[in-house]
Structure formats: C-alpha cells, structure tokens
C-alpha cells in the first residue's frame, strides 16, 4: 500500500537536508521513525503534548544563561535602561500575545493547520528560519534596532 503521507514527510526531510537545515530534517526523520514503528501509538500524545514540551525545552535554553550566571543580574537590570532592550521587551510581549492568538486559532480552525504547517516547514527549510516564537521576536527586534 502506497503511503502518501510518508512520501510527503520524506520530501520535506529531503528539503531540510538540501537547504542544510538539520533541525527540520532530523525532526521529520524522527516522526518518520515513529510513524513506521510501533511507536506510532504515541502520536496522539505527541500531537497533544509536543508543542508544550518543545516550548519548555526552548524556555530552558533561553533561561540557561541566567540560571548559570553567564548573564549577570546587573545586565538584566540595565536592560530596562537601554532603548534597544526596551524594544526587545515590547516585541517579546507582542509576539507572545500573537502566539496565544495563534494557538487559539489553530485549535478552532483546523483547516488552517495544514497551511500553517507547510508554511512553517518551507520557511524553515528554504530561508533557514527556526520555528520558534522567541527567536522570531529577536528577528523583529533586529529589524527595528538594526543588526549588530
């Protein structure tokens, strides 16, 4: 039996490799392994909890410099005195607000999910983007304050 979904996943993984975006390629290959093994029984759990777990891991990565002491408290305090840091804070708030609206939209209008997923994968693969909110916020900040 021909599995169109598997073919699509393989194509997207290939696109990830061709564009040198291992994040996309490895993620899709993991999903392919789950799909073709008995691990496929975990798909409902992955679909329900995957985004939350990803956000937790991302947040750990973002907060690690504070927890490790690499980013000292004095730097955090001074961030409220620098206009670029204030722009970063404002953009972060706006992006998280938009993210909340996006989660609600994806939950209520499932017909948009496929387009969002394809657009995300293509954007990540073709433009070497990263599918995460905080890094998008940083990208927006770089547009406002200039890339330095």
UniProtKB/Swiss-Prot annotation:
The UniProt transmembrane annotation reads 14-34, 51-71, 86-106, 121-141
Under the heading InterPro entries, the entry gives: UPF0756_TM (IPR007382)
Superkingdom: Bacteria
User: Where is the protein found, in the record's own terms?
Assistant: Cell membrane
The record describes its membrane topology as:
Multi-pass membrane protein
Cellular component, GO, one term: plasma membrane
Q: Keywords for this entry? A: Cell membrane, Membrane, Transmembrane, Transmembrane helix
Q: List the disulfide bonds.
A: none
> Where would you say this protein principally sits, based on its record?
membrane
What the entry lists under HAMAP family is as follows:
UPF0756 (MF_01874)
Q: Which family does it belong to?
A: Belongs to the UPF0756 family.
Q: What is this protein called?
A: UPF0756 membrane protein YeaL
Instruction: Supply the source organism for this entry.
Output: Shigella dysenteriae serotype 1 (strain Sd197)
| Gene transcribed to yield this protein | yeaL
């Amino acid at each position: 039996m021909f599995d169109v979904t598997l073919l699509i996943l393989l194509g997207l993984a290939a696109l990830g490799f061709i564009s040198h975006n291992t994040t996309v390629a490895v993620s899709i290959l993991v999903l392919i392994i789950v799909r073709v093994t008995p691990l496929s029984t975990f798909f409902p759990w992955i679909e329900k909890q995957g985004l939350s777990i990803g956000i937790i891991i991302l947040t750990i990565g973002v907060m690690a410099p504070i927890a490790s002491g690499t980013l000292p408290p004095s730097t955090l305090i001074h961030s409220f005195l620098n206009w670029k840091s204030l722009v970063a804070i404002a953009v972060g708030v706006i992006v998280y607000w938009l993210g909340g609206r996006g989660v609600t939209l994806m939950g209520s209008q499932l017909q948009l999910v496929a387009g969002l997923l394809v657009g995300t994968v293509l954007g990540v693969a073709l433009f070497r983007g990263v599918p995460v909110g905080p890094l998008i916020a940083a990208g927006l900040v770089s547009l406002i304050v200039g890339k330095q």
